[in-house]
Regions:
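Cross-family detector of peptidyl-prolyl cis-trans isomerase
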Residues: 1-197
Length: 197
């Protein structure tokens, strides 16, 4: 265990040119141990967060599956069509333009096309699997809510500081257009819906 007080005093003495109670090599060794301990703590916390998020997500999806209008695909994607579209239906090879809002299961909004300046365009096959599958269920003008389990989203990796490991995601989506984007559409799509490699 590192005595932070002794370490801090030694570092201050070194910077002030005073006599140091430890050599530079000893200070580096202590610093390396400290950094390693911090990394181990962060890794353990991330593993615990992943476990908790997965459990909460599974419970959310189990309850959500019983709600009126919610359907579950073979992959585990849950969706609710809130407005039937009348236009073209996309394939995985198409480019689409959408409006969306992404939330965590606690309701925290982590991304939205409105906040990013308007509709966003992207290739259907270049986003997370839950989006690739879900967007193909809609026709132009259609709207839906996608309830995406972690295995169809960012899995144990998470995305940035907003989407934790094994997070279940909820997206309200409107399919604006299938095909080449309009000039007003933002490109490329934000990281929160990009495909995880």
């Amino acid at each position: 265990e590192i005595d932070l007080k002794v370490f801090t005093e030694a570092m201050e003495a070194m910077f002030e040119g005073k006599e140091v109670k430890m050599t530079e090599a000893q200070a580096q060794e202590v610093m390396m141990k400290f950094l390693q301990e911090q990394q181990e703590k962060a890794t353990a916390k991330r593993a615990e967060d992943a476990k908790v998020n997965l459990e909460k997500g599974e419970a959310f999806l189990k309850e959500n599956a019983t709600k009126e209008g919610v359907k579950t695909s073979a992959s585990g994607l849950q969706y609710k069509i809130t407005k039937e579209g009348e236009g073209k239906k996309p394939t995985k090879d198409d480019m689409v333009t959408v409006e969306y809002e992404g939330r965590l299961i606690d309701g925290t909004v982590f991304d939205s096309s409105k906040a990013n300046g308007g509709p966003v365009s992207f290739p259907v096959s270049q986003v997370i699997p839950g989006w690739t599958e879900g967007i193909q269920l809609l026709k132009e003008g259609g709207e839906a809510t996608f309830y995406i389990p972690a295995k169809l989203a960012y899995r144990e990796v998470g995305a940035g500081d907003k989407i934790g490991p094994n997070a279940t995601l909820v997206f309200d989506v409107k399919l604006v257009k299938v095909g080449a984007p309009d000039a007003a559409a933002q490109q490329p799509v934000q990281v929160d819906v990009q495909k995880v490699q």
